[in-house]
Curated annotation (Swiss-Prot):
Any Pfam family: Dimerisation
InterPro entries, per the entry: COMT-like, O_MeTrfase_dom, Plant_O-MeTrfase_dimerisation, SAM-dependent_MTases_sf, WH-like_DNA-bd_sf, WH_DNA-bd_sf
Protein origin, superkingdom: Eukaryota
Family matches, as PROSITE patterns: SAM_OMT_II
Originating organism: Catharanthus roseus (Madagascar periwinkle)
Designated name of the protein: Myricetin O-methyltransferase
Active site residues of this protein: H250 (proton acceptor)
EC number in record: 2.1.1.267
Reaction(s) the record says it catalyses: S-adenosyl-L-methionine + a 3'-hydroxyflavonoid = S-adenosyl-L-homocysteine + a 3'-methoxyflavonoid; S-adenosyl-L-methionine + a 5'-hydroxy-3'-methoxyflavonoid = S-adenosyl-L-homocysteine + a 3',5'-dimethoxyflavonoid
Single GO MF descriptor: myricetin 3'-O-methyltransferase activity
Record-listed N-acetylmethionine modification sites: M1
Keyword Protein biosynthesis set for record: no
PTM: The N-terminus is blocked.
CDD domains: AdoMet_MTases (cd02440)
Length: 348
């Protein structure tokens, strides 16, 4: 069927938008590095282009280009243009203020690293070779080995910590009942303890343990109801009333997930005694049936990310149910989404 001229025009416009989709995120990274969100916030009111330009640490010869940078940032919805050349923050860019508790700057900078982009650019080569991941094709080693030997690992920890701050701010106020009545909780793969610290603060009588690889928790200071323990979740998990895994299992293949879940099963008491596993994970939705388009896009993007960087994936409810059953659990309950992820209680 021959395309009409209007269809060709629309297709071409859409084509160029998609081909250059990286430009908006690269521009946002530039804005963060230049301190544009903080400059506008510190101004205390919508900020004129001239004032913004004068406040930034740029070479004077580059001043005329700030207008063009702001134009794409406004078009992408990152900033709002109150009137011509007068800018203000949006809820999105408030997440990029250095002193904000929900600061997610490390996430913007982390996903735009050369190491990450190199992996994405190796995807077509990966489809034609025997490597397990495109990341391995790009770097000659898997993600975990690369992260353990390179500063990239610290950047990854920063990205996960930023995500944990966002999750904890929504998880504890809205889903605090998940932790009520517990005497002890182990946060498996809890990194530097961002979520566990928030839980321990909200539930001072709850003994919280952060369990992660020894090099991750080394030199981290324990408190009265929070301690850090090093180890390997594939070998043994410390005992507790409940085990928390936030966005951990999506990094692993089904067989490895079952192994970790079996370790969790051994570490908790029976359901009658309050034993449970709490997951924060994506439950893939049918994009044609769900009205939350942004959440669906985030889930699909996360799934392809798992393909490129890990031998893993995001999962549907049916796929989760299969893993729980194979690991020896009797049931589960999926709660409403926090963002594009949901709390899941799994019962022995």
């Amino acid at each position: 069927m021959e395309l009409q001229s209007s269809e060709i025009r629309n297709a071409q416009a859409h084509f160029f938008t998609q081909v250059f989709s990286f430009t908006s995120m690269s521009s946002l990274k530039c804005a963060v590095q230049l301190g544009i969100p903080d400059a506008i916030h510190s101004h205390g009111k919508p900020m004129a282009l001239s004032d913004l330009t004068n406040s930034l640490p740029i070479n004077p010869s580059k001043a005329p280009y700030i207008y063009r940078l702001m134009r794409i940032l406004v078009a992408a919805g990152y900033f709002s243009e109150e009137e011509k050349n007068v800018y203000s923050l949006t809820p999105f860019t408030r997440l990029l203020l250095k002193n904000d508790p929900l600061n997610s700057i490390s996430m913007v900078l982390g996903v735009n690293q050369i190491a990450e982009l190199k992996a994405w650019n190796a995807m077509s080569e990966w489809f034609q070779n025997e490597d397990l991941t495109a990341f391995e094709t790009a770097h000659g080693k898997n993600f975990w080995d690369f992260g353990a030997e390179d500063k990239y690992g610290k950047n990854f920890d920063g990205v996960m910590a930023a995500d944990s701050i966002l999750v904890s701010k929504m998880l504890i106020p809205e889903f605090n009942y998940l932790f009520e009545g517990l005497d002890s909780l182990v946060d498996v793969g809890g990194g530097t303890g961002t979520i566990a610290k928030a839980i321990a603060k909200s539930f001072p009588d709850l003994k919280c343990t952060v369990f992660d690889l020894p090099h991750v928790v080394a030199n981290l200071e324990s408190t009265e109801n929070l301690e850090f323990v090093g180890g390997d979740m594939f070998e043994k998990i410390p005992s507790a009333n409940a085990i928390l895994l936030k966005w951990i299992l999506h990094d692993w293949k089904d067989e490895e997930c079952v192994k970790v879940l079996k370790m969790c099963r051994k570490a908790i008491p029976e359901k009658e005694k309050g034993g449970k596993v709490i997951l924060i994970e994506t439950v893939l939705m049918d994009s044609k049936k769900h009205e939350n388009e942004e959440a669906v896009k985030a889930q699909i993007s996360s799934d392809i990310d798992m393909m490129v960087f890990f031998t893993a994936k995001e999962r549907t409810e049916e796929e989760w149910a299969t893993l729980f059953r194979e690991a020896g659990f009797s049931g589960y309950k999926i709660f409403p989404m926090i963002d594009f992820r949901s709390p899941i209680e799994v019962y022995p």
